[in-house]
Amino acid sequence: MTQDVGFVGLGNIGRPMAVNVLKRFGRLAAFDIDTARVRTLAEAGAVATGSLAELALKTRVILLSLPTSAEVERVLHGDGGVAGSAAPGTLVIDLTSGSPPRSQDIAKRLADRGIRYIDAGVSGGVAGAEAATLGIMIGGSNADVADAMPYLQAIGKTIVHMGPVGAGHMTKSLNNLLLAANMVVASEALALAAKAGLAPEKVVAAINGSSGRSYITEYRFPNFVLKGDFSSRGGMAMSLLVKDVAIACDTAKSSGVTMFVGNLVHQMLMRISDELGSTAPNQSVARAIEGWAGVQIRSSKDA
């Protein structure tokens, strides 16, 4: 049985997720600090709310899509936040790529008020959000995850319950560590290919029929890098990828797990973010490596 649902955070990936929830259930209360985003969604049939407190009073399930755990804490526990107005039993579904320890602390503070919480990191970018095919990694109790499932099924395709609160966000950070590492090494390999006089699109095609293939070579390079498309549709901002990789590296350090490659990738991402700007989409890793190598990784058809 579904209940009145709210959505906070209507950014690049939040808005298409909110649209799909609205399509599935026919009702949605929305809030964003950018009121223009709320108005746009209201034109599609959502109920615009003027404050977090108003949204909390209208709903019993609240989905959050925010940049970091810091924003989640402010939205939930700050002045005028959700926790001050939400009824006991309200379920918060945190779609943010958050810090596992902070997610656990957030959950505990909400539980003290009788409010339920699950962390549900999402992967698949804007395209996956629009198509409702996101991968979703969940942390929370069995009962809370079961109650959240109808809403998660409205936005995602591959939905995996990883364990207790924090497990979803931990898994998301590991996913993005692998994403970043693949982006770095694939960009280096393709830059070398271009420098050696090989046609990048042919190298990508060969790799995608061989053991070196990955999501990066199968999707990001053909659809974005080879076309010279470094728009935000290609992936999250560099600042967010840096944050997620830092979560994995920090957790490895505190757990006594050696992570040579992960730490090197993190250092490279920070350098690239400094060079190209923190808001640059993460396929800009390839653009930075192109610059260092003095080549362009482009399809001959798009050159």
PLM regions: where:
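NAD(P)+-binding Rossmann beta1-loop-alpha1 motif at the extreme N-terminus of oxidoreductases
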Residues: 1-64, 90, 96, 161
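Rossmann-fold dinucleotide-binding core
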Residues: 5, 10, 97-177
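Hydrophobic beta-strand scaffold residues
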Residues: 28, 48, 117-118, 159, ...
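Rossmann-fold NAD(P) dinucleotide-binding segment
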Residues: 52-64, 68-117
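Helical "substrate-binding/catalytic lid" subdomain
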Residues: 167-293
